[in-house]
């Protein structure tokens, strides 16, 4: 069993009146771990179903603006998300929690680490900074064109991404996944949870997903060298979707970060290796 339905769901109202949707798994008095989920998967897709309670983790997933239950914020930035999470952690009594950033949620989690929101961070199958000059010759031709277009004309690229649907995104993800990942994604319980998460993420349309994607594909205004909390970077060695070098350069750019390359799995490593990911994170957080 890779995932279960959330134990608790709700929304908080921010100071400007917007809502942020959230979901929680695990004991309410457990060690808080914020979760920044992947592309358009919303608060409904968690991880660590069989280990969260045993580890005493209170996993808290948050919908980014425009996704799921969170109010849209057109033109939002990474800094806006950090400000939202600063309010959210205070309102939910989370203190300075550890955090997990998965896939396209990774740069948002890194921004939170730079902004002092988190006490420790795990990046898992993180969407890398594909606009970084070091990757100019390493990207597949089609991805290179897409990145160049996004950098050159982000508004036009955002309109293109806003044409995506839950079905189109799911087809794209499955078509680029190795068999070891498909074994996870096609498991009945996971497939149902994944579909629900995607449907909720696109409930307000695709604008939230489009904004996320433009931010992730553009040069990041995040000073990775200023991150001072413990960071672990996890990739499956068969992952060909998230980083040109499975996070080697990303790890090197973050002071003191540790790189973990997991054999025989790809982008589904968050669900197949939830226990070592969370156990390591709790150690870094001092829990």
Language-model segments: residues:
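Short beta-strand/loop motif that positions the catalytic acidic residue
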Residues: 227, 233-235
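N-terminal cap/lid segment of alpha/beta-hydrolase-fold proteins
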Residues: 1-24
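Conserved acidic catalytic loop of the alpha/beta-hydrolase fold
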Residues: 79-98
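Catalytic active-site module of serine/aspartate enzymes centered on a nucleophile-bearing elbow/loop
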Residues: 256-287
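Conserved hydrolase catalytic core segment
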Residues: 96-136
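Alpha/beta-hydrolase
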Residues: 141-222
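Conserved alpha/beta-hydrolase "acid-adjacent" motif
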Residues: 240-246
């Amino acid at each position: 069993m890779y995932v279960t339905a959330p134990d608790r769901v709700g929304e908080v109202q921010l100071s400007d009146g917007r809502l942020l949707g959230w979901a929680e798994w695990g004991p309410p008095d457990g060690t808080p771990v914020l979760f920044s989920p992947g592309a358009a998967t919303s608060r409904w897709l968690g991880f660590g179903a069989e280990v969260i309670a045993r580890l005493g983790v209170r996993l808290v997933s948050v919908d980014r603006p425009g996704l799921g239950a969170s109010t849209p914020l057109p033109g939002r930035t990474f800094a806006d998300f950090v400000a939202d999470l600063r309010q959210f952690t205070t309102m939910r009594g989370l203190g300075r929690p550890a955090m997990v950033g998965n896939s396209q949620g990774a740069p948002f989690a890194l921004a939170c680490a730079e902004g002092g929101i988190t006490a420790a961070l795990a990046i898992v199958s993180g969407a890398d900074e594909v606009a970084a000059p070091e990757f100019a010759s390493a990207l597949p031709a089609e991805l290179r064109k897409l990145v160049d277009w996004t950098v050159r004309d982000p508004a036009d690229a955002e309109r293109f991404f806003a044409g995506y649907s839950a079905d189109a995104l799911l087809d794209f993800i499955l078509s680029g996944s190795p068999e070891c990942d498909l074994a996870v994604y096609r498991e009945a319980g996971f497939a149902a949870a994944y579909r629900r998460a995607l449907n909720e993420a696109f409930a307000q349309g695709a604008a939230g997903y489009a904004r996320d994607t433009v931010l992730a594909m553009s040069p990041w205004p995040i000073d990775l060298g200023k991150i001072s909390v413990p960071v672990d970077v996890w990739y499956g060695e068969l992952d060909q979707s998230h980083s040109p070098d499975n996070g080697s350069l990303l790890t090197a750019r973050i002071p003191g970060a540790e790189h973990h390359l997991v054999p025989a799995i790809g982008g589904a490593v968050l669900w197949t290796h939830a226990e070592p990911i969370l156990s390591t994170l709790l150690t870094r957080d001092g829990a």
